[in-house]
């Protein structure tokens, strides 16, 4: 459990109001909400027949896919950096 103070921020995602509670700054929470809202609108334009629950799942799956690709790339670069740094120590 964290003792960090919690922030409550009201946001609107795809026409629905939400109160998000978290330890991030209000600006960060709004940025995340705007990102999700933008993605939902983007996928809605490409898939206009989807209802909101299916659209939300499609959006979540696509965001998770983007995240996992970025994490794999980060892990690959971090491992490369460790190898290169380890090589410098051997000189």
From Swiss-Prot:
Residues 59-86 form a coiled coil. Belongs to the ZapA family. Type 2 subfamily. One of its GO terms (biological process) is division septum assembly. It is found in: Cytoplasm. NCBIfam families: PRK14126.1. PANTHER family: CELL DIVISION PROTEIN ZAPA (PTHR34981:SF1). It comes from the Bacteria. Homodimer. Interacts with FtsZ. InterPro entries: Bac_CellDiv_Activator, Cell_div_ZapA-like, Cell_div_ZapA-like_sf, Cell_div_ZapA_firmicutes. Pfam families: ZapA. GO terms for cellular component: cell division site; cell septum; cytosol; plasma membrane. Keywords: Cell cycle, Cell division, Coiled coil, Cytoplasm, Septation. Activator of cell division through the inhibition of FtsZ GTPase activity, therefore promoting FtsZ assembly into bundles of protofilaments necessary for the formation of the division Z ring. It is recruited early at mid-cell but it is not essential for cell division. Its main location: cytoplasm. Disulfide bonds: none annotated. This is Cell division protein ZapA. The keyword Thylakoid does not apply.
């Amino acid at each position: 459990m964290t003792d960090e103070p919690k922030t409550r921020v009201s946001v609107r995602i795809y026409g629905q109001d939400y109160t998000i509670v978290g330890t991030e700054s209000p600006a960060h929470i709004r940025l995340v909400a705007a990102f999700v809202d933008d993605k939902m609108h983007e996928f809605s334009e490409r898939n206009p027949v989807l209802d909101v629950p299916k659209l939300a799942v499609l959006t979540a799956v696509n965001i998770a896919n983007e995240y996992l690709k970025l994490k794999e790339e980060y892990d690959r670069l971090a491992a490369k950096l460790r190898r290169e740094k380890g090589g410098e120590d051997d000189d």
